[in-house]
């Protein structure tokens, strides 16, 4: 075990604070509509230019181990806020730095850090409740567009695109952001259920111009295992031919003789048919097949539940209004599934999402949920250069996350105004002793930090802005940094999701309070420079 360096009390807080301030100084410049860009070096390729706070925070690693611990703890605030709310990372960083800075001063002046922490916790709880009270629900598409526009740094086209996507696929529908191959940013909405498996043979194609299979009002055979020969399938194939309807086969695979026979029948015109592989792998494949069965009012054909292929009848097959199959995707449009059955399946998946602790499982369950609840919208981000596309994609990701948060918990006045106005919750709050009251005062001062930083980034003196807003009786009045005017933030459409503001404050208060109560730090002693020792040769130990 390597030797350790241990530091105590004042030195602990000094070193932590230096690390916190270094990270905060790099992140805070991105806050607000006039926030600046940060250029991040890459080990290969062009540097990355971003205005996304969490992207900047994640890149910061300091040489001094003790300073680095401070930076990493505040970086954790940004990451956690991003994970929970999807936005507000810069606000969380600015709040955490402000609370710790003021707290460290008071501890250095002789106050009890544990009482300061109690005061901070009391104040944060009161402010969180106040913000929740001030939140108003998001109802209209225009309000959703406003939230998206603000989070995308005033880009109205992004806000409108996100609002359009949510309108099409529903609030729980999947909206993905991808890099486009053109210069334009566009929204592509996939109605119904889509999964990433295409036709097994191009001979199944019915629309040669678009190279896709189009099946109208088809039967859908959902089979768990591979199909190697068609002997067992003959009864159901004959029944489908007599019905005059097309047939889609979804199974683990269709190979050899079975695939050849299907293709020959299709080419002869005897049977309009197509086959695709099942989506997913392992147990997840079985679950997705079950979802397709529920959506199309069919049965999954599986020997596990005692159904053999030779015994399958037409009423066991799924139905849909239309199926489109391209090279890599299959889209089932308007399945015949019973609404109550689909809702029961949705409720079951939601319960599994609540119970699971694995991020990967949660993501896959959410994909299943989205496929059942309302299709998929894809925002394809275009730009003149790769750098521009990546920067824009960051902003759209932020905007999308902020919009989801707004739908969940409502909106409050943006631009730091909600935090500033929530100070009213602390007006009559006092602690059991002066040190707890001092902890409350730390939070009261920190609530001004985001609006001060937004003003500073716009080149305006933050203290003057705060003074004017405090004097105003209009609770929604704030500073529009874009136009450098004082406006009603709600009417001007400058809003923040309540969830983002609350998550930022809660996480910042939690980490900053822990930093204040740190009294000792332990880190490995850096190893001596190997190159220097090699240069000293046999006398490498000289000077010890």
UniProtKB/Swiss-Prot annotation:
Its main location: cytoplasm. GO terms for cellular component: cytoplasm. The gene is groEL4. ATP binds at residues 30-33, 51, 87-91, 415, 496. Forms a cylinder of 14 subunits composed of two heptameric rings stacked back-to-back. Interacts with the co-chaperonin GroES. This is Chaperonin GroEL 4. GO terms for biological process: protein refolding. SUPFAM superfamilies: GroEL apical domain-like, GroEL equatorial domain-like, GroEL-intermediate domain like. It is found in: Cytoplasm. Belongs to the chaperonin (HSP60) family.
